[in-house]
Swiss-Prot record:
The gene is psd. The record marks G251, S252 as: Cleavage (non-hydrolytic). The lineage of its organism: Bacteria, Pseudomonadati, Pseudomonadota, Gammaproteobacteria, Pseudomonadales. Binds 1 pyruvoyl group covalently per subunit. Is synthesized initially as an inactive proenzyme. Formation of the active enzyme involves a self-maturation process in which the active site pyruvoyl group is generated from an internal serine residue via an autocatalytic post-translational modification. Two non-identical subunits are generated from the proenzyme in this reaction, and the pyruvate is formed at the N-terminus of the alpha chain, which is derived from the carboxyl end of the proenzyme. It comes from Pseudomonas putida (strain W619). Pfam families: PS_Dcarbxylase (PF02666). The active site is at D90 (charge relay system), H147 (charge relay system), S252 (charge relay system), S252 (schiff-base intermediate with substrate). This is Phosphatidylserine decarboxylase proenzyme. It is a peripheral membrane protein.
Length: 287
């Protein structure tokens, strides 16, 4: 009954209004508030501040600065397996596996369209049909910056407007097409393993999504918008393996896609496996 009421509330709540309010709270600079709230949050979720570049909770200008905190340079060593594809974020594997018949597995009884996830452009989605996906959920206690699984050159970014359902096991099992309905930012890269997509999916009270090349991604009118980076006079944007790609200001999920016969997921990983940025996510399929 509790789960059913929770799901009903997800459809009734004003997602974007709540997220804007959460964003205002998270950016509050009043020392008495931001210090108390940050201390409560760090204790409630057992955040490990020993690995943070700035360990003093009171040194952050607001809660969002704490939430998107940088780590010490040696906190996340990169896996040295030849050709390793790295975990892009701290968190847990929600699901991973093949993209079958254009669908990505969400939870028992549910899948979602890879085409819709990527914004609805068949040409953009075609290289990933029959490929592989990994969905990684970032919990409140996790480090909330997302990094490159593999070195790549940015080709395209697509902002896809949508709802902001909460993302957790309950919603994954009960909200159809969850990740293809929530607001998201799709980042397309050319890599040595062919096209790679990293999709940053928003959720309830996720105030914003940022990328290192565009900053805050919030197009006017919240309409679907495509940004091309492989044409015109602008210099190519190349990011090395392990480099920061973007960050969540509160919450959610990163989904990584590769084309067919390009990668094989690490045998140690499965649904529910904990991940740390820089650890082995996959190895290349040998030609």
């Amino acid at each position: 009954m509790k789960s059913r009421l929770f799901i009903i509330s997800q459809y009734l709540l004003p997602h974007h209004l709540l997220s804007r309010l959460a964003g205002c709270v998270a950016e509050c600079r009043a020392r008495w508030f931001k210090n108390a709230f940050t201390a409560w949050f760090a204790k409630r979720y057992q955040v490990n501040m020993n690995e943070a570049l700035v360990e003093d909770l009171t040194a952050y200008e607001h809660f969002n600065a704490f939430f998107t905190r940088a780590l010490k340079p040696d906190a996340r060593p990169l896996d040295e397996t030849p050709g390793a594809i790295l975990c892009p974020a701290d968190g847990a594997v929600s699901q991973l596996g093949p993209i079958e018949h254009g669908r990505i597995f969400q939870a028992k009884g549910h899948s979602f369209s890879a085409l819709e996830l990527l914004g609805g452009d068949p040409a953009l989605a075609a290289p990933f049909m029959g490929g592989e996906f990994a969905t990684i959920y970032l919990s409140p206690k996790d480090y909330h910056r997302v990094h490159m699984p593999l070195a790549g050159t940015l080709r395209e970014m697509v902002y896809v407007p949508g709802r902001l359902f909460s993302v957790n096991q309950t919603t994954a099992e009960n909200v159809p097409e969850l990740f293809a309905r929530n607001e998201r930012v799709v980042c397309l890269f050319d890599t040595e393993r062919g096209p790679m997509a990293v999709v940053l999916v928003g959720a309830m009270i996720v105030a914003s999504i940022e990328t290192v090349w565009a900053g805050l991604v919030t197009p006017p009118k919240r309409e679907l918008k495509t940004f091309r980076y492989d044409e015109g006079s602008r210099a190519p944007i190349h990011l090395e393996k392990g480099a920061e790609l973007g960050r969540f200001k509160l919450g959610s999920t990163a989904i990584v896609l590769f084309g067919p016969e390009q990668v094989k997921w690490a045998e140690t990983l499965g649904a529910g496996s904990a991940t740390r940025m820089g650890e082995l996510l996959a190895v290349p399929v040998q030609a």
